[in-house]
Amino acid sequence: MNPVEKLALLRAEMKKRHLDAYVVVTDDFHASEYVGAHFKAREFLSGFTGSAGTLVVLPDAAALWTDGRYFLQASQQLEGSGIELMRMGQPGVPEIPALLRDHVPENGWIGFDSRTISNDFARSIGEKTREKHIRFAGDEDLVDLVWANRPALSCEPVWELDVKYAGLTRREKLAMVRGKMKEMGASVFVIPSLDEVAWLLNLRGNDVLFTPVFLSYLLLEQDTATLCVQREAVSAEIEAHLKSDGVTLAPYDDIYRLVAALPTGTRVLLDGERANYRILQSVPESAEVLDRTSPIQLM
């Protein structure tokens, strides 16, 4: 299929759900700089292979935003696709929230996979479209419905980094981060960033090109830690080592259920630039969100 045919299929799914726009970003669920083949939804739909870009699909139009590194490449690869190239930073080029405000009707719906949209990006769209009472539908990955033979999520084996290379043991690092949590008044720290999880637990993987990390989230409390990961990626030996350091395993997608089950009064630390929108939406109203730069970034 070419991009025109793929967009037609996507629009058919949008129409079934009464969506007035659908946003497809380049990110995975963890705001990683590089993404695996499973997450190349924007590339699949548009044919544009650059590493940065966001596609917005409307019922009768589509546009792709990218930066100056890719203006020439994008103009060539989008030719004949029906997708307008939006050259970011150039005069007269609207930002994505402004275009959505101008093209989505009053009380309309904007769809996206909320696991791939950052909280900050969703907030910027919400602020720009609030006056028109535009709503979000983020529970479905519509690209998955039109992408036959989509590559599966990467699930390469996780391995342990020896402390002589890591510098500190897993227990020492966990104690350091828990100390920072206390200073910040947080009872729970949701860690979605793959590099931070890998550093904190002295684990490595091969799920992302050019980066020795593995698909995972960590829910850290003062007395417990839950690693949400594809279980088949973790050997029984590594699971036992983690358990001895107070880290238990849960299925990869359980992060949303675990966050939603946090008790009343929980103070949840997370980094809004790195946490996806679905995580933020999962936090109970009875809990308090502390949107701060991750303390791990400062270690």
What positions do the PLM features span?
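Terminal domain-start leader segments
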Residues: M1-M299
